[in-house]
């Protein structure tokens, strides 16, 4: 949270130096300034994750990718199939005598909430550079529809995950990592929540401060991505692809 506040102060200082004279958020911070800040903050951590994934792939004996393996892995990840457990009744990490799909559904909300937010940014980028359609966008535009729905799923999902972790047995995982996991979930939820608040109050006098806080949280999330549980999604997908390869190899061998 200290990093969020720190980055928010940086954005506030940038705004104080001078605005771009644009509309909406761009009246606070120009589009070019946002790109200059966030492009490297997003791409450099991804490069770090990619290098690490390459090493992981070599370590597990990964083979050249095939479309069938990718489709199998993405389908399995999209359904959160492994969180249903082998018997399909869900997890019992809260109570050994009671199985539940709650953890699976919460993961669904977080994952699809994040993907919708990412889709919102991606669509807005295409509209800006490909079609000359610049922000601000109306509520019924794809960037807003994806962003608002994704923000709601992300906020609700992260809040539910924190409550679920409070009830879970910490000894079933690494106790030393529990605090870091909670911190990451709270940060991710704060990104969604601050975005929703910014949208709701974007036409008021508090918009510049809310924009600084939201951008600060997003920048913090990007920079910490390789060092938080966010990275496990990449490794999990790679492991699912490798598992699909092994199953295909076994079926061919039979």
What are these regions (language model features)?
Residues 1-254:
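Membrane-embedded alpha-helical bundles of multi-pass integral membrane proteins
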């Amino acid at each position: 949270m200290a990093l969020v506040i720190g980055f928010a102060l940086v954005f506030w200082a940038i705004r104080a130096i001078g605005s771009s004279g644009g509309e909406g958020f761009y009246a606070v911070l120009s589009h070019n300034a946002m790109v200059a800040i966030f492009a490297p903050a997003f791409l450099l951590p991804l490069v770090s994750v990619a290098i690490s994934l390459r090493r992981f792939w070599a370590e597990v004996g990964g083979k050249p990718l095939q479309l069938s393996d990718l489709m199998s892995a993405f389908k399995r990840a999209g359904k959160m199939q492994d969180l249903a457990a082998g018997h399909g009744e869900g997890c019992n990490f809260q109570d050994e005598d009671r199985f539940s799909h709650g953890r699976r559904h919460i993961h669904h909300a977080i994952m699809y909430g994040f993907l919708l937010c990412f889709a919102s940014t991606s669509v807005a980028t295409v509209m800006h550079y490909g079609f000359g359609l610049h922000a601000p966008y109306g509520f019924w535009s794809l960037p807003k529809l994806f962003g608002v729905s994704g923000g709601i799923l992300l906020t609700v999902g992260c809040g539910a995950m924190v409550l679920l972790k409070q009830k879970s047995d910490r000894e079933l995982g690494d106790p030393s990592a529990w605090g870091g996991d909670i911190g990451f979930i709270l940060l991710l939820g704060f990104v969604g929540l601050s975005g929703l608040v910014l949208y709701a109050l974007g036409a008021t006098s508090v918009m510049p401060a809310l924009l600084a806080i939201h951008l600060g949280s997003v920048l913090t999330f990007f920079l910490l991505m390789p060092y938080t549980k966010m990275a496990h999604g990449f490794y999990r997908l790679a492991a699912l692809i490798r598992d699909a390869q092994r199953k295909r190899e076994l079926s061919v061998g039979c």
